[in-house]
Amino acid sequence: MKKCIGLGMAGLASLLWLAASSAYAKAGVDRVLLISIDGMHAIDLQNCINGIEGTPPFCPNLAALAQNGITYPNASTSRPSDSFPGLLSIVTGGSPFSADIFYDDSYDRSLAPPANPNNGINNGVPSPACVVGTPGPGTELKYDESLDTNWDPVSGVSTSINVPSPGIATTNLALDPMNGCSPVYPHNLMKVNTIFEVIKASGGHTAWSDKHPAYDLVNGPSGKGVDDLFTPEINSMVSAIPGVSVPGLFSCDTAVPDPDVADWTSSFKDIKCYDQYKVNAILSEIDGKTSAGQDIDTVPTLFGMNFQAVSVGQKLVQKVDVAATVTGGYQDAAGNPSPPLLGEIQFVDGAVGQMVTELKNRHLFDSTLIVITAKHGQAPINPALVNKPGDVVSPVLAAAGVNLVQVTEDDIALLWLENQSQTDTAVTTLQANAADIFLDTLYSGKSLLKLFQNPLTDPRTPDIIVKPTLGTIYTTSGKKIAEHGGFSADDTNVMVLAANPSIKGRAINAKVTTQQIAPSILSQLGLDPKSLQAVKIEHVPALPGLR
């Protein structure tokens, strides 16, 4: 004890680091490969590794991982189940209660609208709506492809999959009056830190790949959490991707299979090219290189990516010629995938197999924990339940004299009222028109406060959330047959699989959330889960079996 005191603060810090390193070594895990198969339900994993009603299984690589892995059939992602809060649940351990991010398209009453290209921060003049030192007047927060520096407002997509650095057009960002009317980058929205920041602070190397430059979000409040952030734009014009081929299917090197579609999400084939591009980045990182192939002789301590192929396979109705379409999704309530969806699931399984093979080739497999989950599910699974009435919520409220400053709709409706004193009127109106809006559950007042912050004091929390009946999507689009973002089990009951050769294969049926992944990753690396602010705020434990 006297020796410890005599070492002073620097020596004590060293001892603490050694203690952490000892726990790290004892766990036998040097790194974590984290994967989100967006849209992948728990039932999808069960079906693909076990087969459905006597049919053969169709995911040999996921099945092999499950042999030495823990599956969690009753895992739930965030509510709302949008990609932004869904990913933050995984990498912060927080729900929107602590992270305070509800959707990639939401609202903040304390911020000001973006500057415009001709009169904004690019030429040093603040937007007229932004007054330094005065909160508001409020603005939509839209963090998607429309932030890209090469986004084309006419086509609605970016002109290239590789968005030129720095990637995000500052004139499209909301402004913060309390910070000199400076632009609010996605990472500036963050109120809690991420596992990337904790691992980087402990000396680790970090990498992540996702679908928009707006996923700068994962950098956390510091803006520096991810050393190698690779974000090819998914909503960009399709084009050949040099060096990319989908094993056993087709090459994307000189041309894509469907060159005439709007973007990568509009083709069951092209989306495979897009995802394979990111898979190649992971393979490069396993080889001790950056996502771009630069040799750095370092394999990340935490790295990973999201897949979009399954999500596209669940949602898309693809027009293949003037008169014909191909429809994805499921064939029944049991989750039998349609042929297009089956192809996407098998592609992702094969891609996971590529990563496992490369880890083994580099003698890294035994010391790597592989965690596979999903930011969100997709609803409905049962195609008979699909109901697309369009926007029926806003007109009902408008007729009652209730104006909205923002409505965000998918298979959920998040409502921000212009006048928050009209909340009771809005609730009464919605309840009176329950059949017309296909209402299942309404969250406001006390029911909202059980999940989130108070919208009267928190500038981002919606005043009302409308959960519609299962299968209802507030759209009239003929291009999709499913959506996510909602609170239903189809939206939230996602796969979670944690695998390593040292793990005894089993299923743990306890109810868990994807929030528990973040503290689990840190504990497996010998780091303190309570280093995560959201974990402390919400008292989030590690996953059973990984504590």
Question: Where are the language model's segments positioned?
Answer:
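Beta-strand elements within well-structured catalytic alpha/beta cores of enzymes
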Residues: 30-42, 64-66, 90, 199, ...
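Secreted, luminal/periplasmic, and some membrane-associated catalytic domains
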Residues: 37, 73, 80-82, 92, ...
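Short, structured active-site-proximal loop/turn typified by the sulfatase FGly-forming signature C/S-X-P-X-R
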Residues: 46-100, 205-207
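Short, solvent-exposed turn/loop segments enriched in Gly/Ser/Thr/Pro and often Arg
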Residues: 71-91, 209-219, 308, 533-540
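Acidic, His- and aromatic-enriched active-site or binding-groove loops in soluble protein domains
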Residues: 92-105, 207, 223-286, 324-345, ...
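Catalytic-site neighborhoods of secreted/periplasmic enzymes
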Residues: 132-254, 532
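Active-site neighborhoods of enzymes that stabilize oxyanions during catalysis
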Residues: 165-175, 179, 188-193, 402-520, ...
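Active-site His/acidic residue clusters
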Residues: 213, 217-225, 289-347, 384-386
